[in-house]
Structure formats: structure tokens, C-alpha cells
Swiss-Prot record:
Its main location: other. Enoyl-CoA hydratase; part of the gene clusters that mediate the biosynthesis of the host-selective toxins (HSTs) AK-toxins responsible for Japanese pear black spot disease by the Japanese pear pathotype. AK-toxins are esters of 9,10-epoxy 8-hydroxy 9-methyldecatrienoic acid (EDA). On cellular level, AK-toxins affect plasma membrane of susceptible cells and cause a sudden increase in loss of K(+) after a few minutes of toxin treatment. Its EC number is 4.2.1.17. It comes from Alternaria alternata. Signal peptide: none annotated. This is Enoyl-CoA hydratase AKT3-2. Belongs to the enoyl-CoA hydratase/isomerase family.
Length: 296
């Protein structure tokens, strides 16, 4: 197991990190309430660093994101701009996209506790997360066309897959502000809760259930299977079969069966880091996607 890292002792830019606690739950708080938790480039960079560290830390079982105060995140801080633009179109990389990919590539389950308004990258950064729980009072907007730009943070990939092309096009085309309970957002949130103050406690309940009762490897590979988007049931069947063959031989599979028969909670130990180290079903190769991934 990797040495436990003290996340809270580091001077992150406008981020507060709580945990991981005894169950392995870490909370990343966007702590810039005086600016509606608008993101700066140092905040984006720090979140990517945090995700990398937590992904490699065996003591972290689940990561929860939330916002300080009444907002979840009002998007990029426009007073600071969008960061350095690449020298050419081919070399420029969207900062929000870098964060989205860091979340996507993190093996640990991620949960967004959307306690208030989420706009622009404030909502698109949550799309790669495993679960989104929002306050019914939260307002949501994808305002890119109102700023003469296009969707960011790989949201043109995620949003249609989460809510369908029709709803995604409506949200992107209008750029308007909608209630979290709007029918246009149907399917985006796993749950909506009555108040902003209930959002984080509910997210922590879900996180604790995941941390205590599920296999890290099984959860990560299942998510990868879903996003791989097999083109036919036959393709899905072949890939699932290959992964199942490997998992049937794992200690966690044996523990899962044994704990069920003994009517107790499982004590899973396998990690994705260990699986990759053994050369079994590498992510980005035979698990998720093509033999060679696009060069970024």
C-alpha cells in the first residue's frame, strides 16, 4: 500500500481537502465563495494534481467534490481569462478538458455534490464523474454560445451520452439557465435533494456505501466498459467475457463470494495499480478503447 499523504496540510489554491477518513472518503471543496467558486488556472492545476495523488493512494476509496457557500461553481473566472493559448490550433489544449480527462482517468469513484448554481465548466467538470447529486434549488447552464465559444471539458462527448442528443443540443443551443429539476436535465443527476445543505451529507452517504461495499477494480472496469461504447452486443459480450475471465481468478472475486455466503461485509484489497502492474487488461488498451489511444 502506498504511504498515506496529508492532503489537508498542503497549500492548495482556493481548495480545501478533507480526509480521507477511516472509510477512505476524501472531499475536495471549491473554496472561493467570495467569487462564487469561479475556477482559476491554479485551482484547475491543483485539482489535477490532487486527482493524480488520490488515484495512486490506496487509502482513498471515493472522492466527493462540492462548493463552499451558496454556489457549486460559476465557471471560469473571466477576470483572469482562459489561460495561455497554444501556439497553434494543433497544440492548444483546453484547461477544462485537462481536468475532465483527469477525472475520467481516475480509477476512484467520483461524486459531485452540487449544492448550488453550476455554470460552464462548473457543470461540465462534473460530467465525467461517476455520480452527480444536486440540490433542487441549483441552477444549471451551459452558456458557451452566449460567450461566442463552444462546449469545453469534453462535454460534447459526455453530455449527449448522459441525457441524449436532443436535450444536449437544446441546452448547448440556448445557453440558458435552468432549474436542476428541469426536464431538459433529466438523467444528468442521479438524485436531487430538497436543500443545498442536504447535498453533501447525501453524497457522503452514497460515497460511504461505495467505499465499504464495492470493489475498486470491479467498479473501475465496469465504468470503462460503459464508456467504451461497444458497437454491437457481440463486441460487448467478447470484452465482458475477457474481463470476467481475469476477475474470476482474483482474490477480490473470491472474497466477494465468501463474504456473501458468510453474510458479512466484504474486505476487498485489489487495486487497479496492482492489476496494471501485473500486465492484466491494461486500461486504454484491451479494456477501454483502441490498441492505440489518440495522442494528446
Amino acid at each position: 500500500m502506498l504511504n498515506r499523504f496529508s492532503y489537508s496540510s498542503n497549500a492548495w489554491h482556493n481548495l480545501r481537502v478533507d480526509g480521507p477518513d477511516a472509510d477512505g472518503i476524501a472531499v475536495i471543496v471549491l473554496a472561493r465563495s467570495q467569487s462564487r467558486n469561479a475556477l482559476t488556472l491554479p485551482m484547475l492545476t491543483d485539482m489535477i494534481q490532487l486527482l493524480s495523488a488520490m488515484d495512486a493512494d490506496d487509502s482513498v476509496k471515493c472522492i466527493v467534490f462540492t462548493g463552499e457557500g451558496q454556489f457549486f461553481c460559476s465557471g471560469v473566472d473571466l477576470t483572469e481569462g482562459f489561460g495561455e493559448i497554444g501556439k497553434t490550433r494543433d497544440t492548444h489544449r483546453d484547461a477544462g478538458g485537462k481536468l475532465a480527462l483527469a477525472i475520467h482517468n481516475c480509477c476512484k469513484p467520483t461524486i459531485a455534490a452540487i449544492n448550488g448554481t453550476a455554470v460552464g465548466v462548473g457543470i461540465t467538470m462534473t460530467l465525467p464523474m461517476s455520480i452527480r447529486i444536486a440540490a433542487k434549488t441549483a441552477k444549471i447552464s451551459f452558456p458557451f454560445v452566449r460567450r461566442e465559444i463552444v462546449a469545453d471539458a469534453a462535454s460534447s462527448f459526455y453530455l449527449p451520452r448522459l441525457i441524449g442528443y436532443g436535450r444536449a443540443l437544446h441546452l448547448f443551443t440556448t445557453g440558458a439557465l435552468y432549474s436542476a429539476e428541469s426536464g431538459l436535465l433529466h438523467g444528468l443527476f442521479s438524485e436531487t435533494v430538497n436543500s443545498a445543505s442536504s447535498t453533501l451529507p447525501r453524497a457522503l452517504e452514497v460515497a460511504r456505501d461505495i467505499a465499504i461495499n464495492t470493489s475498486q477494480v470491479g467498479g473501475c472496469l465496469t465504468r470503462d466498459l460503459i464508456y467504451r461504447s461497444s458497437q454491437s452486443p457481440e463486441q460487448a459480450h467478447l470484452l465482458e467475457s475477457a474481463i470476467l475471465y481475469t476477475r474470476y481468478q482474483s482474490r477480490d472475486f473470491k472474497e466477494g463470494v465468501k463474504s456473501f455466503l458468510e453474510k458479512r461485509k466484504p474486505r476487498f484489497q485489489d487495486t487497479m495499480r496492482e492489476q496494471s502492474g501485473e500486465g492484466v487488461l491494461e486500461r486504454g488498451d484491451c479494456v477501454v478503447g483502441l490498441a492505440s489511444k489518440p495522442k494528446l
